[in-house]
UniProtKB/Swiss-Prot annotation:
Organism, scientific name: Scolopendra viridicornis nigra (Brazilian giant centipede)
Domain of life where this protein originates: Eukaryota
Location, primary (coarse class): secreted
Summary of the tissues where the protein is detected: Expressed by the venom gland.
The protein, known as: Scolopendra 4610.56 Da toxin
GO molecular function: toxin activity
Length: 31
């Protein structure tokens, strides 16, 4: 659904930020 697509988009953005954090502290990296 459209709502699911938006939700996945936000998760994608969050995961991209977490991957950036991983350069400093990989405890934040998604498992």
């Amino acid at each position: 659904s459209e709502t699911d697509s938006r939700k996945e988009g936000r998760m994608g953005q969050k995961n991209a930020v977490i991957r950036q954090w991983c350069e400093n502290d990989c405890n934040y990296a998604p498992k």
